């Protein structure tokens, strides 16, 4: 331990102790909060089913930074490089299109065996896995509908894909000893004025009921559903709206996924967490950064990221909220994108854990809003960075921006060779 870091750490402990915070306990709590990193940042959501195909479903990865992963081996190697630079517990979130097979596999026929390499890798790296059916970038999603499709056979194809995905998810949980959260997001919607908004939602309701009809061990698998305001090509109507999925998750007692970019730009998911928790058993968060729309920019340590983390910590939602990331920026080094976004999420959680919440609650209950605001603002300038640096050191990861040197070296040695 360097003398400088040790001195800063001791001073930070004293400063936080003065406001009633045990920093060692905060670090122990931080180690209870894994962040699920999303595999698709590494290859711009290409996957391995048809990596040269177009990305559809109203989502878009912009940029052409060299060195993106071209196969599962490269993607896993890139993930390992990123994870070495991120302290604390992590998980990996996979989409169905990241299967591995020597022969083509129809999406309604995916099986656990197509993901066994991911499971073995996760075991070796002490990671949990999460999962998603991939209801986009496919000929049978080309007209903008999947689980709500009016064609019975097409709708059944997507139902069967989601059913198969649940079995893969349960396999992850059984093999790794930690439940896999499987999130269903569909792009279904219409570009222009929609006359019948009810029928697609009726079909989606029935389809989802069929999807989750097979009983799976909740110790292995958790169902989640995700809403969206709009997507490219579905600006006027989205079948799976917030109201639809809030009602579905409440009535079926599934987890509800809140994506930071899936609402109107003036809405924030941090304000939705406490409301949703009154009705649903668990939440899945997709922490992202929307810039004017669901642009999926890299997560910053900004006000909303901090507010999300604070809601989790203030209400002791450690066992009911699953933290995932969802962004994909192809204009910068993809490994750096993972590192920046994930470290920022963890920094926000640490800052939340260092807040004197009990004292702030007392002030709020007493109506002393002056002191509440003063304390909240003074808290921002306390030396949380020294606590973060100690946390990084204990996890053998870089404490500051020196991680970028490792990324640059990897880029020169590995990424530059990919063409």
UniProtKB/Swiss-Prot annotation:
GO terms for cellular component: cytoplasm. GO terms for molecular function: L-rhamnose isomerase activity; manganese ion binding. One of its GO terms (biological process) is rhamnose catabolic process. It is found in: Cytoplasm. It comes from the Bacteria. It catalyses: L-rhamnopyranose = L-rhamnulose. InterPro entries: L-rhamnose_isomerase, Rhamnose_isomerase, Xyl_isomerase-like_sf. Its cofactor is Mn(2+). Keywords: Cytoplasm, Isomerase, Manganese, Metal-binding, Rhamnose metabolism. Its EC number is 5.3.1.14. Binds 1 Mn(2+) ion per subunit. Mn(2+) binds at residues 262, 294, 296. Coiled coil: none annotated. Transmembrane segments: none annotated. Pathway: Carbohydrate degradation; L-rhamnose degradation; glycerone phosphate from L-rhamnose: step 1/3. The keyword Manganese applies. Catalyzes the interconversion of L-rhamnose and L-rhamnulose. Belongs to the rhamnose isomerase family. This is L-rhamnose isomerase. It comes from Escherichia coli O139:H28 (strain E24377A / ETEC). The lineage of its organism: Bacteria, Pseudomonadati, Pseudomonadota, Gammaproteobacteria, Enterobacterales. The gene is rhaA.
């Amino acid at each position: 331990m360097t003398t400088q870091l040790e001195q800063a750490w001791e001073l930070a402990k004293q400063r936080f102790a003065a406001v009633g915070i045990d920093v060692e306990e905060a670090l122990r709590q931080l180690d209870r909060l894994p962040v699920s990193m999303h595999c698709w940042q590494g290859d711009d959501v290409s996957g391995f089913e048809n990596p040269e195909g177009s990305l559809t479903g109203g989502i878009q990865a912009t940029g052409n930074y060299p060195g993106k992963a071209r196969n599962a081996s490269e993607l896993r190697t890139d993930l390992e490089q990123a994870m070495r630079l991120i302290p604390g517990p992590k998980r990996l979130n996979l989409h169905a299109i990241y299967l591995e097979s020597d022969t083509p596999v129809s999406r309604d026929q995916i099986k656990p065996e197509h993901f066994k390499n991911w499971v073995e890798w996760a075991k070796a790296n002490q990671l949990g896995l999460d999962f998603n059916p991939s209801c986009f970038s496919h000929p049978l999603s080309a007209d903008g509908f999947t689980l709500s499709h009016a064609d019975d056979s097409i709708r059944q194809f997507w139902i069967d894909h989601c059913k198969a995905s649940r079995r893969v998810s349960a396999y992850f949980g059984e093999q790794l000893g930690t439940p896999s959260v499987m999130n269903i997001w569909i792009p279904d919607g219409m570009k222009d004025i929609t006359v019948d908004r009810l029928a697609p939602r009726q079909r989606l309701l029935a389809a989802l009921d069929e999807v989750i009809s097979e009983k799976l061990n909740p110790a292995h698998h958790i169902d989640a559903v995700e809403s969206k305001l709009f997507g490219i090509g579905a600006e006027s109507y989205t079948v799976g709206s917030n109201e639809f999925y809030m009602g579905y998750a409440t009535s079926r007692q599934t987890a509800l996924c809140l994506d930071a970019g899936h609402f109107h730009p003036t809405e924030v998911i941090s304000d939705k967490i406490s409301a949703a928790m009154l009705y649903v058993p668990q939440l899945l968060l997709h922490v992202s950064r929307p810039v004017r729309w669901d642009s999926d920019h890299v997560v910053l340590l900004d006000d909303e990221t901090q507010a999300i983390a604070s809601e989790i910590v203030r209400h002791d939602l450690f066992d009911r909220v699953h933290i995932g990331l969802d962004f994909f920026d192809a204009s910068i080094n993809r490994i750096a994108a993972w590192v920046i976004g994930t470290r920022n999420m963890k920094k926000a959680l640490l800052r939340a854990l260092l807040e004197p919440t009990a004292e702030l609650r007392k002030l709020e209950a007493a109506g002393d809003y002056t002191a509440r605001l003063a304390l909240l603002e003074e808290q921002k300038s306390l030396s949380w960075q020294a606590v973060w640096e100690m946390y990084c050191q204990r996890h053998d990861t870089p404490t500051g921006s020196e991680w970028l040197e490792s990324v640059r070296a990897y880029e020169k040695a590995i990424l530059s060779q990919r063409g």
